[in-house]
Amino acid sequence: MASQRAVQLSLRKPAHAVCVIGVGTLVDVYSDVPKGAKTFEVSGSSEVKIYMVYDPSRVAEPAGPAHWPLDANVDVVVVADTVSKNLHDLKVKVSYFKSQDTAALAHSLLYLTAVDVSLDVDTGRTGKVKKGSGDKKNWRWGSGGSGAILLVNCDRDVHGSREDLHDSHLRSLEDLQDMSPMVLSCDGPDDLFKSHKPVLKASLPDSRRLGVFCARGGTSLSNYKQVLGPRHNSYEVERHPGERDIQFYVEGLAFPDASFSGLLSLSVSLVDTRPLSEVLVFTDSVTFRVAPWIMTPNTQPPLELYVCSVTDMHGSNDKFLEDMSHLATKANCKLVVCPRLENRNDRWIQDEMEFGYIDAPHKSFPVVFDSPRNRGLRDFALKKILGPDFGYVTREIQFAGASGLDSFGNLDVSPPVRVGNTEYPLGRILIGGNFPKSSGRRMARVVRDFLHAQQVQAPVELYSDWLSVGHVDEFLSFVPTSDQKGFRLLLASPSACLQLFQEKKEEGYGEAKQFDGLKHKTKRSINDILADRHLRRDSAHVQKCIDWNREVLKQELGLSESDIVDIPQLFFLKGAYAEAFFPDMVNMVVLGKYLGIPKPFGPIINGRCCLEEKVRSLLEPLGLRCVFIDDFLFYHQLLGEIHCGTNVRRKPFAFRWWNSVP
């Protein structure tokens, strides 16, 4: 039972006070006491409950009709349980006595006006506000937790250039659906609210990260006014006569980040505004958490496949687009082609952006994270993807340009995993960087800070700086499976490739040639490859780099060797950095059970590519379908593959992030 300020009583005149129903008011029975008084008793209106608060070790509770001793260890708290119909219509009477058997020496009177003032939000996470439900001030994770949730209003419901969060005026009623409802109860005698005003307030830092709109009903946009936000952190609520509940809508303006935990608080105070008063009568507070941006792994069903139409010295990539169209059709997935006019001949759409989503009990929608690489596709996400119920977020690097590791081919996420006793029901984010405690390239801190601050997909930093491009998608991928594990981790493996070629040599196919079927590319026999000491040395170095990541992934994702599939792949060093010797097969696009895999142009044995056959034998028993696609001229020769040149929006998790415990 929360208590307000103490109300002092007087023997000379009645005291008057305002109380909030359900909230204790401390009554000071000691400030003005008649001479000779030793005991007291308290009575009141039937709508007022009276509580004696005391320490049993110091004060004995009186028996029967006996009075309470005038002892400073005894407090009187009164609680009204009904809203007043008129001013001062509830009474509390304190009588003072010299002894138990004598008449009262004097009486003090307290007249109360009881009001209902509370701020309520969806603490139960049902999508609806329930009055008086649970602890509103504290936000708790987990399936048994509580606390309201805000979405960052980062979509654009009306055509314009920026996200809705930049608007201080409501531009469409649909925008209210992106906001969290909040109800202010202010029931009581109208005359009281002429002098006592509800004041809504946020701290200055919080006011820069949220917006609050007051709703006065109707379908006109003018009925909705922003009352709190970056320009104002306090609002004296305009209560109309007879009004019991006032509706508000709250929007998030910023995602969690290095300097922002994601928690935001709002309070309402009932303030006595009469001259020479300005007394704070009561305060109620609520706490929101801003919904994090969540990535979706390859195990989630695909919804849309994005790919760019480009032209270069080899002509147009129409054949590749046709292959992507066939793959999308098989996977029952929509194909979205970004035309040259919009991509400015930038084909690396995976590097430009990452699809994710935000989720609250009342609303969810996809959000695209625009990378800071800012090349030909730099305007595509903002101008062509941002729209109604499709949000946008980005992080820009200050005072420096983006490195190759800031592209989002260097950003992935695992399926849900369990590591020891720790559950990661939304998986873990994977990013690439330099070898620990060494100099080298890393993803920009501003991006890493953003990813860590989302909390629900705790990032793991891998070692990718050994690659020329430096992206994690060059040596790993995840594929869905129908068994109990639900997925496999695919790792590129030079050792597996050399072992396969050695087996084929021993079977008598040493003269079968890599790159058979490719024009303008020197063919190399299996014998030649196996005899190439430089290639073997490079392969040994690359294998060590991948093996280091393998151990990190096993530890951080709770994987065993049976959860990993080694995909044969050779690399060579160009200077100090590695590049794929033939199209990098782990750099695939995953559309459900259909895998769009870079065609490796491996040695042809008995009419079939031995590399393709090996990969089929590894993956198709898992229920997957391998579709090998030629990306050699338009992607591989430019140090990228199919995954680099495509992007997939996937179905969000059924699991609700607030039920996790980071």
Swiss-Prot record:
Q: List the keywords (alphabetical).
A: Calcium, Cytoplasm, Hydrolase, Metal-binding
Sorted alphabetically, which SUPFAM superfamilies does this protein's record hold? Cupredoxins, Pentein, Peptidylarginine deiminase Pad4, middle domain
Q: Where in the cell is it found?
A: Cytoplasm
- Positions annotated as active site in the UniProt record: 644
Induction remarks: Induced by all-trans retinoic acid.
A family per Pfam: PAD_M
Question: What is catalysed by this protein?
Answer: L-arginyl-[protein] + H2O = L-citrullyl-[protein] + NH4(+)
- Which residues does Ca(2+) 3 bind? 352, 370-371, 374
Query: What highest taxon heads this organism's lineage?
Result: Eukaryota
What InterPro entries does the record point to?
Answer: Cupredoxin, PAD, PAD_C, PAD_central_sf, PAD_N, PAD_N_sf, Prot_Arg_deaminase_cen_dom
Which of this chain's residues are annotated to bind Ca(2+) 4?
A: 350, 408, 411
Q: Which residues bind Ca(2+) 1?
A: 153, 155, 157, 164, 175, 178
| Protein EC | 3.5.3.15
Q: Name one GO cellular component term.
A: cytoplasm
Give binding positions for Ca(2+) 2: 155, 157, 178, 363
Q: Does the keyword Repeat apply?
A: no
Answer yes or no on keyword Calcium: yes
Which cofactors? Answer: Ca(2+)
A GO MF label: calcium ion binding
Q: What does this protein do?
A: Catalyzes the deimination of arginine residues of proteins.
**Family from the record:** Belongs to the protein arginine deiminase family.
Subunit and partners: Monomer.
Q: What is this protein called?
A: Protein-arginine deiminase type-1
Species annotation: Rattus norvegicus
Designated gene of the protein: Padi1
